[in-house]
UniProtKB/Swiss-Prot annotation:
Domain of life, source organism: Eukaryota
Keywords: Ribonucleoprotein, Ribosomal protein, RNA-binding, rRNA-binding
GO molecular function, one term: structural constituent of ribosome
InterPro entries in UniProt: Rib_uL2_dom2, Ribosomal_eS4, Ribosomal_eS4_C, Ribosomal_eS4_central_region, Ribosomal_eS4_central_sf, Ribosomal_eS4_KOW, Ribosomal_eS4_N, Ribosomal_eS4_N_CS
Protein family: Belongs to the eukaryotic ribosomal protein eS4 family.
Name of the protein described by the UniProt record: Small ribosomal subunit protein eS4
GO cellular component, one term: cytosolic small ribosomal subunit
Domain S4 RNA-binding: 41-100
Gene Ontology annotations of biological process type: translation
A Pfam family that the UniProt record links to this protein: 40S_S4_C
Length: 259
């Protein structure tokens, strides 16, 4: 039996990390944590490649050892810690707050938020079950286990989780008419209103979604993350508000910026 893999070649790293092919042989391999390797971004890459606060890997590690970076309210000093969708990254020394969100090309964007919005995060409910002595337990997609949740919260619903008190303050049902963010598949990063649910026996359910520009698309239920009641989002959205432009629309936008 072989042990765990400890290295990651740059060519095998997720494409959304946007690493230079000629920048070296290896990439940072994220530690096991709340997010999967292919769906996460290590803290060192966030500081160096996204924020440009460090010129190299060593500088990023030195910033983290000063205990000034918090992820979801907890100080993180490991440069391999995997940050992922909806995580709140706070840098105390500069009083900056960021939420990890996808753009419409599936890449993590540096989305700055206000201090008031940094107090909470949204978590998708992965399972609801009972454990020893009949205690109800809820698990979320970011690895949290919460005891004695609201009995009305079901699988695929979204909870509003207060980071400072570690309590559920609100919940949003997974139902038609609510606003959702797509977190995987070819439509990753798109935002729209949930339409009808297509149930397929023996296969994953298909959810039909329509964005604010009137474009309709469909994706698997596992890729749908509810972020608001009706058409009002509970969190601020990055530039573009999750609307994917066609190739022609992107070209026209670039031409307009040049003139």
């Amino acid at each position: 039996m072989r042990g765990p893999k400890k290295h990651l070649k740059r060519l095998a790293a997720p494409s959304h990390w946007m690493l230079d092919k000629l920048g070296g042989v290896f990439a940072v391999r994220p530690n096991p944590g709340p997010h999967k390797l292919r769906e996460s971004l290590p803290l060192s890459l966030f500081l160096r490649n996204r924020l440009k606060y460090a010129l190299n890997y060593t500088e990023a590690k030195k910033i983290l050892t000063q205990r000034v970076v918090r992820v979801d309210g907890k100080v993180r000093t490991c440069h391999k810690f995997p940050t992922g969708f909806m995580d709140v990254v706070a840098i105390e020394r500069t009083n900056e707050y960021f939420r990890m969100l996808y753009d419409t090309k599936g890449r993590y964007v540096v989305h700055r938020i206000q201090a008031a919005e940094a107090d909470f995060k949204l978590c998708k409910v992965k399972s609801v079950r009972t454990v020893n002595k009949g205690v109800p337990v809820l698990t979320t997609t970011d690895g949290r286990t919460i005891r004695y949740p609201d009995p009305h919260v079901k699988v695929n619903d979204t909870i509003v989780f207060n980071i400072s008190t570690q309590k559920i303050t609100d919940s949003v049902k997974f139902e038609p008419g609510n606003l959702a963010y797509v977190t995987g598949g070819r439509n990753v990063g798109r935002v729209g209103i949930i339409g009808h649910r297509e149930r397929l026996p023996g296969a994953s359910d298909i959810i039909h979604i329509k964005d604010s520009a009137g474009h309709s698309f469909a994706t698997r239920i596992s890729n749908v993350f509810v972020i608001g009641k009706g058409n009002k989002a509970l969190v601020s959205l990055p530039t573009g508000a999750g609307i994917r432009l066609s190739i022609a629309e992107e070209r026209d936008k670039r031409m307009a910026q040049k003139h």
